[in-house]
């Protein structure tokens, strides 16, 4: 087995997308060295070069007025690469930045920022304007390190001088050649002639890279007999002078040829690109048509097709026709409550359901739902205040979008209300049926519970004829100005949740006032829409994870959301790591994910309640007899030895723990000594012998495996455990055309439903059990959730396959091991006792901050959907300082936790740190509570908050962090942090030193660089 190399992820070129990206970051490295230089010796001037079009500007990365920090440097660019000025800014890694100074524009507004860059592998950067909030972007790789690529995003600039900063966020960023800026909103009123045709080969179009005009086979029937092909490796085709008489929404029909499924990114007027996966045509001589909607401004427009560094279809022509209107009509959202007089009602415990002349109301103790049967729209209110208005449902069936509002009949029958009792409690199920001639029935289903602050909403599409299929079912959609209004405007945020914990993904608490590049901010499975100041807010998310990957798209302004779509069928290269579309769910009846919607006085309570709602559907994995149910304590090999693991090192570690840490670093006598990847450096006999030594020392042995990945390239290699019946070429996951899916993280995905895959798992895991291992870390599980063509014909989606594969693992292990999911989706969650809350942590201060970002917004998983949240190991010797090493211990202790060290015990400095930092009884007791601390603040963007709190019976614990290498003073409002009276006296005990102090109202904490503090807090009456 080989561990992945993080910097060289090996993604397939042809499937790199620049649109529909969930925000993810590498990691944040605090405490830069402070080195700051100005680019010197550049041939270009710092001033902008005004382009031919008004409102366009170009700035060179090597301009003398720019500022470089950290390792950033100006270097030469190969002549063949074609860098403007012959130079680039490179070395953007490990805490470096490039700032373009004096970006001067005449007009304030939204500008399209085009970055000309070079990146031989996929890399990211953070962009901030005028010192404002930093946004993260994931750039696709260019063909190689000698090929330029282009990436577009939108920024808001003020009139006059501006600064634009590119930050590597502690990771690795591309080399930057230059940036171009173009005013985006320079159009006026006006629609094109219906059905206007624009040829790809037209003389005024602009082709870049490999793109070229070529002949088209006569049988294909291309208009004009020609097409534009070779859209690969960083090429573009731009249609110029797309004329519109008035601004509005238009249907764009793309006539194309593609013998295999290929994506293409499309941008209008140099705006944000959106990626579309065009289905394959019958062959490379057959035309296909793909239709979508775009917004055009009055006058001349441009439409650009970009291969994103991969492979895109050949383009014959475009046809543009008016779609009608200037945007989607939200419907009569302000008249939803006009439903006439009440006709009849029934009570079900504390829930009252009332039928009205033109609608119905469903009312619980906490909330009410009003459904208008004339408009097909719903409104949700809590405590008498409407927070959501204009809610409806949609489903994409092949090329037909079903919209519940557009059905001719919306019916509700009181007699059809069902009493229910399930894991959520007692309640009712209410169904609204939408019917139209010639369309399948769409059912909107609400489940209300007597004792829950949330309700559940889902949808079904039911066909009386042929089966229907969809990979986009949205039971909750809002498209109305101010459609979601939580009623406050202190510091309104939307939480963006990553699908898994791979590639150093981060959560983001983004300002609700985000209306640009929103495809970058799709949240996976759940979100919170809240005011950080008052903490009130909505929590919305899926509670069923048997079929769908759920996405949440949103857009907002003026402290409200104008768009919200919660849908099953979400895939993204950077979030779910899928390289093809979500699988289609087919049947006479197809059902969406079930979505919980709740409002809370404290969004943190809401997130925990959301976790409980999921556990009500799929409880966390139980501890079977013989598996200790307490916090796992011990050691893992990866941080210490990586690929150099050996039998002698395992024995040395086991002996060291017995001789030095047995009495202090343990959970009631249980200590795990775990071998990570490269355990197969040991022979079978050495593995058996190592387990014997570990057990003799009074410890338990742990092991590692990646059940859904293949690290090799030999598709003829026999699969172990199958007696030669299957090769890896048989069990790797493929697309519908039979093509092997590209590597992700350097590994091929294995089909969890294939019998060869399952036999492999049985063969390896039964050996582990036979050797005597009692703990297993299973890694790269996200590969098992990829969309593809699975062996089991009943499996239509990646999540269905994942459920099957994980259930098979549980069955094979038979409850005899502690199961820790490492790189894994957050959901489904019922197959592991613990899950890593973040990606790999190497012990440095920057990685600790990154890990605590995941705790800041993901703590609620602890004790709800997982018994424990795993902060990854503590490699103390890599902290860089004693303070940073101690901070790593504090971070692990408050995280929920799997309490594992990962130091090289032959290193004298590591030994000292282990003996000093792993033996504090009071600190270890906090870790053994097994509860994750809550964040005090939730307004940190992609960073971690610096104050966390845990209430333990009558007492509290408080953790305070300094993520920089400079001294810092933290002032903590005790009422906000602990909820205590402003006049209450509080006794603080420093957990590490035992020092006591008494304070009230606020606490001032003086921290050295990289230092953190843990306090026990007693509130005196």
What residues fall within each predicted segment?
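Sec-dependent signal peptide cleavage junction
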Residues: 23-47, 52
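Extracytoplasmic
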Residues: 47-334, 980
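Carbohydrate-binding surface patches
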Residues: 103, 121, 240-242, 260, ...
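Polysaccharide-binding surfaces and accessory modules of carbohydrate-active proteins
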Residues: 187-191, 331-367, 385-438, 442-559, ...
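Conserved structural scaffold segments of CAZyme catalytic domains across common CAZy folds
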Residues: 415-417, 434-440, 450, 454-456, ...
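The substrate-binding groove and active-site-proximal loops of carbohydrate-active enzymes
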Residues: 633-648, 674-682, 743-759, 786-799
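Glycan-recognition surfaces
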Residues: 718-747, 751-755, 759, 804-909
């Amino acid at each position: 087995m080989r561990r992945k190399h993080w910097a060289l992820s090996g993604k397939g070129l042809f499937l790199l997308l620049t649109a529909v990206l969930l925000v993810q970051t590498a990691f944040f490295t605090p405490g830069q060295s402070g080195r700051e230089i100005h680019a010197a010796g550049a041939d270009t001037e710092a001033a902008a070069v005004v382009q031919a079009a008004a409102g366009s500007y170009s700035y060179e990365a090597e301009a003398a007025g720019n500022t470089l920090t950290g390792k950033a440097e100006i270097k030469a660019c190969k002549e063949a690469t074609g860098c403007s000025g012959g130079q680039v800014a490179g070395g953007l890694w490990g805490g470096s930045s490039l700032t373009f100074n004096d970006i001067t524009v005449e007009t304030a507004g939204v500008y399209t920022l085009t970055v000309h860059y070079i990146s031989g592998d996929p890399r990211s950067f953070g962009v901030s304007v005028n010192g404002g909030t930093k946004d993260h972007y994931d750039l696709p790789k260019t063909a190689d390190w000698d090929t330029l690529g282009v990436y577009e995003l939108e920024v808001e600039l003020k009139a006059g001088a501006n600064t634009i900063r590119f930050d590597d966020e502690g990771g690795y960023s591309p080399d930057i050649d230059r940036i171009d800026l173009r005013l985006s909103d320079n159009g006026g009123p006006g629609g094109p002639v219906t059905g206007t045709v624009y040829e790809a080969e037209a003389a005024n179009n602009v082709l870049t890279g490999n793109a070229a005009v070529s002949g088209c086979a006569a049988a294909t029937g291309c208009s004009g007999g020609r097409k534009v092909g070779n859209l690969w490796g960083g090429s573009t085709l731009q249609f110029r002078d797309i004329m519109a008489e008035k601004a509005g929404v238009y249907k764009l029909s793309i006539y194309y040829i593609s013998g295999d499924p290929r994506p293409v990114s499309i941008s209008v007027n140099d705006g944000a690109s959106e990626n579309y996966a065009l289905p394959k045509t019958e062959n490379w001589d057959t035309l296909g048509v793909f239709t979508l909607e775009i917004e055009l401004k009055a006058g001349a427009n441009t439409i650009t097709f970009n291969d994103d560094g991969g492979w895109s279809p050949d383009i014959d022509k475009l046809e543009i026709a008016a779609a009608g209107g200037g945007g989607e009509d939200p419907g009569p959202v302000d008249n939803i409550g006009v439903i006439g007089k009440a006709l009849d009602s029934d009570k079900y415990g504390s829930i009252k359901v009332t039928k009205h002349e033109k609608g119905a109301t469903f009312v619980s103790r906490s909330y009410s739902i009003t459904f208008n049967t004339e408009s097909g729209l719903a409104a949700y209110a809590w405590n008498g205040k409407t927070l959501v208005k204009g809610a409806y449902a949609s489903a994409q069936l092949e090329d037909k979008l079903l919209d519940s509002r557009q059905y001719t009949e919306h019916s509700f029958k009181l007699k059809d209300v069902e009493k229910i009792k399930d894991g959520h409690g007692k309640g009712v199920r209410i169904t609204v049926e939408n019917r139209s001639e010639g369309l399948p029935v769409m059912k909107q289903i609400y489940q209300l519970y007597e004792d829950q602050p949330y309700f559940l909403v889902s949808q079904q599409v039911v066909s009386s004829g042929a089966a229907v299929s969809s990979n986009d079912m949205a039971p909750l959609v809002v498209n109305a100005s101010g459609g979601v209004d939580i009623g406050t405007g202190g510091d309104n945020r939307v939480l963006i949740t990553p699908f898994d914990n791979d590639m150093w993904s981060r959560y983001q608490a983004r300002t609700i006032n985000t209306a640009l590049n929103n495809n970058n901010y799709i949240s996976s499975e759940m979100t919170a829409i809240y005011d950080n100041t008052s903490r009130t807010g909505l929590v919305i998310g899926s509670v069923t994870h048997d079929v769908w990957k759920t996405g949440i798209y949103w857009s907002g302004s003026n402290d409200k959301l104008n768009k919200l779509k919660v849908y099953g069928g979400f895939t993204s290269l950077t979030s779910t790591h899928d390289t093809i579309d979500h699988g289609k769910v087919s049947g006479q009846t197809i059902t969406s994910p079930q979505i919980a919607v709740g409002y809370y006085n404290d969004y943190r309570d809401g997130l925990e309640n959301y976790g409980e709602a999921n556990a009500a559907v799929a409880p966390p994995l139980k501890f079977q007899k013989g598996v200790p149910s307490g916090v796992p304590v011990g050691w893992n090999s990866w941080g210490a030895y990586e690929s150099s693991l050996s039998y002698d090192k395992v024995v040395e570690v086991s002996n060291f723990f017995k001789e030095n840490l047995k009495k202090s670093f343990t959970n009631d006598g249980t200590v795990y000594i775990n071998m990570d990847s490269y355990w197969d450096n040991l022979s079978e006999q050495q593995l058996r012998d190592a387990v014997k030594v570990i057990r003799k020392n009074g410890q338990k042995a742990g092991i590692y495996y990646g059940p859904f990945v293949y690290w090799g390239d030999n598709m003829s290699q026999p699969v172990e455990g199958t007696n030669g019946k299957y090769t890896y070429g048989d069990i790797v996951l493929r697309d519908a055309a039979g093509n092997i899916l590209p590597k992700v993280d350097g590994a091929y995905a294995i089909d969890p439903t294939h019998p060869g895959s399952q036999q492999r798992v049985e063969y390896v895991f039964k050996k582990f059990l036979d050797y005597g291992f009692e703990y297993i870390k299973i890694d790269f599980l996200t590969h098992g959730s990829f969309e593809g063509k699975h062996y089991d014909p009943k499996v239509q989606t990646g999540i269905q396959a994942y459920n099957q594969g994980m259930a098979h693992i549980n069955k094979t292990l038979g409850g005899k091991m502690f199961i820790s999911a490492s790189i894994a989706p957050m959901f489904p969650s019922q197959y592991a006792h613990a899950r890593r809350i973040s990606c790999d942590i190497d012990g440095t201060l920057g990685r600790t901050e990154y890990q605590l970002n995941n705790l800041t917004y993901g703590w609620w998983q602890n004790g709800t959907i997982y018994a424990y949240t795993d902060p990854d190991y503590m490699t103390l010797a890599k902290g860089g300082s004693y303070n940073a090493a101690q901070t790593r211990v504090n971070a692990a202790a408050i995280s929920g936790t799997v309490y594992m060290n990962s130091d090289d015990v032959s290193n004298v400095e590591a030994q000292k740190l282990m003996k000093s930092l792993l033996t504090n009884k009071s600190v270890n007791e906090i870790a053994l509570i097994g509860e994750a601390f809550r964040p005090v603040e939730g307004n940190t963007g992609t960073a971690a908050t610096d104050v966390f709190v845990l209430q333990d019976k009558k007492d509290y614990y408080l953790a305070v962090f300094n993520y920089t290498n400079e001294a810092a003073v933290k002032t903590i409002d005790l009422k906000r942090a602990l909820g205590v009276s402003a006049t209450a006296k509080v006794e603080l005990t420093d957990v590490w030193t035992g020092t006591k102090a008494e304070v009230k109202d606020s606490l001032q904490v003086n921290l050295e660089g990289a230092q953190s503090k843990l306090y026990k807090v007693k509130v005196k009456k």
